[in-house]
Amino acid sequence: ANPHDTSVIKSFTCRIITAEAFKNSCPSLDLILTPNGFGIVNNSNVVPASRERVDKLIESLEMERDRAIHLLLSSLPSIPDWLNTAHCRRFASTMFPTLDVVDSLGINFPKWRKYTELRPIIEDIELMIETQYIGHEQMEVFRHEAMTKSSSSTLVSNIIRSLKACEVQLIKDKLSPDPALLPIPSTLTNIVNIIRLHPSEFLEWHNSTIASLYKPVIYENKKGDKAYWF
């Protein structure tokens, strides 16, 4: 499907609405399992489907909805008008504008519910990365690129991929019942070192206050210094 076709967006949206509506209505329906699938009881001689089968139906509807949500979120950035909406800003506020992060954690179900639960954790992790490594301005550039994939730079793409992998590891550490004492991946330092060596590719970082934290101190050998030498 062509993501630039708004009819595709409409199709994904309709799938989400239909699956969600059916899922929400299932508990209030008397369902039966017939040779042709599920049906509503309208005859006193027909035995309703078991709770287990009904729950399985609800789960399958939720999975269908989540697949449609993922497809929709992957397609929406191709619509210029959507990029200027509050909804876009919400999903673009982290490095994970789609449900990919749930897949990276090996979670198959429920994807959308898990994504919404993970967002506060992701936001806390990215705040730490902003203040200690990347800076707000450069993170905003990376987030926009994660959403739109508009950059032609292989280096930028590789940095974003590495940064997201670091975040996934940090999420795993936070979700672990026995988190590591020092869960910060060394890859973050490596990312900063690469950024330092390529000022033309990462202008926002080099123009930020965070860059000064990574500039080596130059010893000037002043007479007042204890280590002064002739």
Identify the function of each model-found stretch:
Residues 1-14, 28-230:
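Conserved short "hinge" loops at termini or chain/domain junctions
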Residues 17:
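Catalytic-loop motifs flanking and including active-site residues across diverse enzymes
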